[in-house]
């Protein structure tokens, strides 16, 4: 159900009857305060200005032709021409009952499902994932889950960095170990980070090692079988590390979703040939460059986008163009979403402009670069270890689980050690994810253990606790939530506020999907839980003296809140528990 969409359709019909232009935006919004109704139609002011008429008079004409008697108990004009819509409690009650009986909580699937390619996580292989990979991984996964929930066909693409000069460096270091008698089948790559660091130190400091590494890159790119065997060893080890992190994070990416850089190797020569044939790329100092006037600097100099090095080597740019061609022309994507650090904005602007010119992106394909900000430490600098090193993502998650266990140990509980451990895992992982996802995607944010693990405020532990409180009501009542289908009555203002919020889930998901911003769902779930707490204090459910029909009506509201929290948190990749 989408109340806003219903009102938009009714408002357009009324405005058409009044004679407003067909492209007039009805400007339907949720009201910010109950005294302004539940929704507002704000079209009259802008339309009246264009038509040089009185906005209140125009608003009255719209109301006179607005057929909302089935859902609204009152419409009124406020201020310069706002139309306030007060929804019928009966309409809300019937809609809540229907949503409670529906597996998808009355959230409709898209009328015209799209094929959406989502490029997310995409770590560089050869070393372990670090905290810098968190945002792309969990933001992208939340959007993927929401798209699938609404019925879109989603193609996950984990564009892992599995090619490039770093592999020549690693192969050279490994070859030296093998030459010293280390058995390739037993070589210790468990600590990839240490292996990479040792190889990098040799690359930077040891005479002759860098040349050796570059020679191995040439061999690898030339298809040398031995180099390829060693390369695959690094890839397999890296992928295994990544998969362990994905499982810990409760992320839906699997090995089948990997579409790494090397997957496009066979296409890169053709990409360059086409760019040259169409005079899109030209030679400059031996390299192939696309000059983009659309991104010219303040002096009018076009942006230079290098697609092939002077020595003939390919770059990220070449691979990204090949990925555009594959996703748009071969997969037939309607949308391509790419979740990458905001610092790569220029690069992806260059990619899209070049791909459009070359035909690698069809006009019908929406190419959406979805940048995100940085996780910062208390010093307002990118999050690091105390010694200034990179924080491994696996270590961060483990610490969060341990901290959650300590917090939970402070609470009285008769749960077993195994149950406590499982709850700590869900709380710890959920806390990290919600703390990140609840911030606007493009914003930097400061990482803070105390706030994210708090059981108060906008946190995962607070929402998880709210869910467990509702489940405990059903255990106490003896009512089977799965078969509960009582009639709902909306009398108290707290009941109405809660019912209205419950019925706005689809609107929230629409915004989240359109703008690729999970924080709107996070905010909605917190508002819902807060309204539930207010409702529960004001509207007794199981207290003595509550009429059975009132009790059952309120139990339906409680049940739908719990299902909405569970569904919403699941869309964020956060697990709930029956007890805490």
Swiss-Prot record:
Phylogenetic classification of the source organism: Bacteria, Pseudomonadati, Pseudomonadota, Gammaproteobacteria, Alteromonadales
Species per Swiss-Prot/TrEMBL record: Pseudoalteromonas translucida (strain TAC 125)
Cysteine pairings via disulfide bonds: none
Protein name: Arginine--tRNA ligase
Family per similarity comment: Belongs to the class-I aminoacyl-tRNA synthetase family.
UniProt GO MF annotations: arginine-tRNA ligase activity; ATP binding
Residue ranges of the motif 'HIGH' region: 123-133
The enzyme's E.C. designation: 6.1.1.19
Localization (cell): Cytoplasm
HAMAP family according to UniProt: Arg_tRNA_synth
GO-annotated cellular components: cytoplasm
UniProt keyword terms in alphabetical order: Aminoacyl-tRNA synthetase, ATP-binding, Cytoplasm, Ligase, Nucleotide-binding, Protein biosynthesis
Oligomeric and partner information: Monomer.
A GO biological-process term: arginyl-tRNA aminoacylation
Record carries keyword Ligase: yes
Catalytic activity field: tRNA(Arg) + L-arginine + ATP = L-arginyl-tRNA(Arg) + AMP + diphosphate
Enzyme class: ligase
Chief site of localization: cytoplasm
InterPro entries: aa-tRNA-synth_I_CS, Arg-tRNA-ligase, Arg-tRNA-synth_N, Arg-tRNA-synth_N_sf, ArgRS_core, DALR_anticod-bd, Rossmann-like_a/b/a_fold, tRNAsynth_Ia_anticodon-bd
């Amino acid at each position: 159900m989408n109340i806003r969409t219903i009102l938009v359709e009714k408002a357009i019909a009324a405005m058409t009857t009044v004679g407003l232009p067909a492209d007039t935006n009805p400007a339907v919004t949720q009201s910010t305060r109950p005294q302004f109704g539940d929704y507002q139609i704000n079209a009259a002011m802008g339309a009246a200005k264009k038509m040089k008429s009185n906005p209140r008079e125009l608003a009255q004409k719209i109301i006179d032709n607005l057929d909302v008697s089935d859902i609204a108990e009152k419409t009124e004009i406020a201020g310069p021409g706002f139309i306030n819509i007060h929804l019928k409690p009966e309409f809300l009650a019937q809609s809540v009952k229907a949503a409670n009986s529906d597996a998808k909580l009355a959230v409709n699937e898209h009328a015209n499902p799209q094929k959406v390619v989502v490029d997310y996580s995409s770590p560089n292989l050869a070393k372990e994932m670090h905290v810098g990979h968190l945002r792309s991984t969990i933001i992208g996964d939340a959007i993927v889950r929401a798209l699938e929930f609404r019925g879109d066909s989603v193609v996950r693409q984990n564009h892992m960095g599995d090619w490039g000069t770093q592999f020549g460096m690693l192969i050279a270091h490994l070859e030296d170990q093998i030459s010293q008698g280390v058995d390739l089948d037993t070589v210790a790559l468990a600590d990839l980070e240490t292996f990479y660091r040792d190889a990098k130190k040799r690359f930077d400091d040891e005479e002759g090692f860098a040349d050796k590494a570059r020679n191995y890159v040439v061999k690898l790119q030339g298809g040398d079988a031995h180099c390829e065997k060693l390369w695959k060893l690094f890839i397999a080890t890296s992928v295994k590390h990544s998969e362990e992190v994905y499982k810990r994070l409760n992320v839906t990416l699997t090995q089948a979703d990997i579409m790494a850089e090397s997957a496009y190797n066979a296409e890169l020569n053709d990409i360059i040939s086409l760019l040259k044939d169409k005079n899109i790329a030209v030679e400059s100092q031996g390299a192939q460059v696309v000059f983009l006037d659309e991104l010219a600097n303040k002096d009018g100099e076009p942006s230079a986008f290098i697609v092939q090095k002077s020595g003939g080597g390919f770059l990220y740019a070449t691979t990204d163009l090949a990925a555009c061609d594959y996703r748009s022309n071969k997969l037939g994507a309607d949308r391509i979403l790419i979740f990458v650090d905001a610092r790569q904005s220029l690069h992806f602007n260059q990619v899209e402009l070049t791909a459009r010119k070359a035909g690698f992106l069809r006009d019908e394909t929406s190419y959406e670069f979805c940048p995100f900000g940085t996780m910062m430490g208390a010093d307002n600098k990118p999050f690091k270890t105390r010694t200034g090193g990179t924080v491994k993502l696996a270590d961060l998650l483990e610490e969060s689980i341990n901290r959650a266990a300590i917090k939970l140990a402070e609470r009285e509980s008769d749960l077993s050690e195994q149950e406590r451990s499982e709850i700590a895992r869900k709380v710890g992982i959920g806390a990290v994810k919600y703390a990140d996802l609840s911030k606007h995607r493009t914003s930097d944010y400061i990482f803070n253990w105390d706030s994210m693990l708090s059981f108060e405020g906008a946190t995962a532990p607070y929402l998880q606790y709210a869910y467990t409180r509702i489940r405990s009501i059903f255990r106490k009542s003896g009512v089977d939530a799965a078969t509960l289908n009582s009639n709902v009555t909306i009398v108290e203002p707290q009941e109405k506020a809660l019912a209205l919020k419950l019925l706005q889930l689809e609107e929230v998901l629409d915004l989240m999907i359109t703008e690729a911003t999970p924080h709107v769902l996070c905010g909605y779930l917190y508002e819902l839980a807060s309204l539930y707490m207010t409702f529960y204090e004001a509207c007794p459910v199981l207290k003595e003296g509550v009429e059975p029909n009132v009790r059952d009506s309120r139990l339906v509201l409680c049940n739908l809140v719990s299902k909405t929290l569970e569904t919403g948190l699941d869309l964020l990749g956060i697990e709930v528990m029956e007890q805490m």
